[in-house]
Regions:
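A structural signal for conserved, well-ordered secondary-structure elements
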Residues: 2-223
């Protein structure tokens, strides 16, 4: 007799809840924050933790300030900055005083590189950033390419394989023909618990939505 359809493993609770809104674009700030903090139980979606002052070191701090404040707001942590110091109330989540400043200071530089080593696409070719689910129900960071990138794709050899990178971290290669069909890049969130994967996916989405920072930024003090 014919066997029945293969049963998929139970979907993690966070992924099941996330399916209600499978693609969350970062433009919908409240929704993205609720998904990140509420669904994954990563923390509370409002800034209700400790008040903190984060001092950044950077030669470009005047140019980076707007992006740093935007990243903080995307996390659900409205912030103000005076010079190099940001004042904000942290989200109510474990190790926030360590994790949040590190996230804010990440470069957020996208590179999509052709086999000869030359970059084909960068942050300027991003149309929209989202958190999505892959076929296994796990969170991924998804980028839609803009009209300029789509026009460029038409001129490339369909069999070329491109290497996507975020801040030098390499992700699975993608064939040009796939991008010609669907001009989207998907960045897997790695291994571990669904909540950890969701945090990685959301972190990457935040730094790409508000990036890259115009120079290297580091943390000099957190109080």
């Amino acid at each position: 007799p014919m066997s029945g359809p293969t049963k998929l493993p139970p979907r993690p609770k966070a992924a099941s809840l996330f399916m209600a809104v499978p693609i969350v674009f970062l433009g919908t700030l409240g929704l993205a924050v609720a998904i990140l903090f509420g669904v994954t139980r990563f923390g509370d979606q409002t800034a209700s933790g400790d008040q903190v002052s984060i001092t950044f070191g950077a030669s470009c701090i005047d140019d980076a300030r707007t992006q740093l404040i935007a990243r903080a707001g995307q996390i659900g942590m409205p912030a103000t900055m005076d010079g190099e110091t940001m004042t904000a109330t942290l989200p109510d989540m474990p190790d926030a005083a360590n994790l949040i400043p590190k996230l804010l200071a990440r470069q957020g530089r996208l590179s999509v590189i052709e086999p000869g080593g030359e970059p084909v696409f960068d942050n300027g070719h991003i149309d929209a950033v989202a958190i999505d689910l892959n076929e296994a129900g796990m969170p991924v960071t998804m980028l839609k390419l803009n009209a300029e990138a789509r026009a460029m794709l038409k001129t490339l050899d369909a069999d070329l394989e491109l290497q996507p990178e975020i801040d030098g971290e390499a992700f699975p290669k993608i064939r040009v023909s796939s991008l010609q069909d669907t001009p989207e890049l998907s960045f897997p969130s790695g291994e571990g618990k669904t909540s950890d994967r969701m945090k990685r996916a959301a972190d990457r989405a935040i730094i790409l939505e508000h990036g890259p920072l115009p120079c290297r930024v580091h943390i000099t003090n957190v109080t």
